[in-house]
A protein has these predicted regions:
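Flexible, acidic active-site loops/lids enriched in D/E/S/T/G that coordinate Mg2+ and/or position polar
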Residues: 1-27, 34
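Acidic active-site catalytic centers that drive phospho-/nucleotidyl reactions
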Residues: 3-6, 37, 106, 116, ...
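Proline- and acidic/polar-enriched loop/turn elements at helix boundaries
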Residues: 7, 36, 102, 122, ...
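Buried hydrophobic positions in well-ordered alpha/beta secondary-structure cores of metabolic enzymes
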Residues: 7-8, 73, 110, 134
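Residue-level preference for nonpolar/small residues embedded in alpha-helices
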Residues: 16, 82-83, 126
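Acidic beta-strand-loop-alpha-helix segment within the catalytic core
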Residues: 21-108, 154-174
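Oxyanion/phosphate-interacting regions
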Residues: 88-91, 108-174
Length: 174
């Protein structure tokens, strides 16, 4: 699965905060993924085939398992404006909310430990590379209903540290 310009509006309007992404599945199983932050010349890559994730040539550790109160969350603006599934309470319980407008860049922020959660309505080409990389590093990747993500369907996807995941699922199901 390829997303050549993830964050198209950012590419057009800002000339930054966009990424190119590739997810490779082999015999129906996640194999490798690549997210390239074009403007920062930063390639995050790896997957189950390697059992590791790298940023350029540096192997990355698993992100710290920050609780929701100790981390930043990224939640899509339409979800916040509609308070979809009580997401405003998620924001209040966190250290703050950020939204870049590119799933690839949001996944990089999670993988590098800058955020503890990302919640957005995503299409497969938006989430598959981040799913492969995130799960390789021990992040939780589920639907907002705490179900397995269907890799061929669009859905509201929650990617988070395991601690933040548990707290967010409780808040969005109140």
């Amino acid at each position: 699965m390829i997303d050549p310009i993830d964050g198209t509006m950012n590419f057009v309007k800002e000339k930054e905060n966009f990424a190119s992404m590739i997810a490779i599945y082999k015999q129906g199983k996640p194999y490798m993924a690549y997210i390239y932050d074009v403007m920062k010349d930063r390639l995050v890559w790896g997957g189950p085939a390697l059992g590791a994730v790298y940023c350029n040539q540096t192997q990355l550790p698993a992100p710290k398992q920050h609780a929701l109160k100790d981390g930043l969350v990224a939640i899509s603006c339409p979800m916040v404006l509609a308070n979809y599934r009580n997401v405003v309470e998620v924001i209040k319980a966190s250290s703050g909310c950020r939204m870049v407008g590119s799933a690839g860049i949001e996944f990089i922020n999670l993988i590098l430990g800058k955020h503890c959660a990302y919640l957005s309505y995503l299409r497969p080409w938006d989430f598959l590379p981040g799913k492969i990389l995130g799960e390789t590093l021990g992040l939780s990747v589920k639907t907002i209903d705490d179900e397995k993500v269907d890799v061929v369907s669009s859905s509201v996807v929650l990617v988070a540290t395991k601690s933040a995941h548990t707290e967010i699922i409780e808040l969005v199901n109140r």
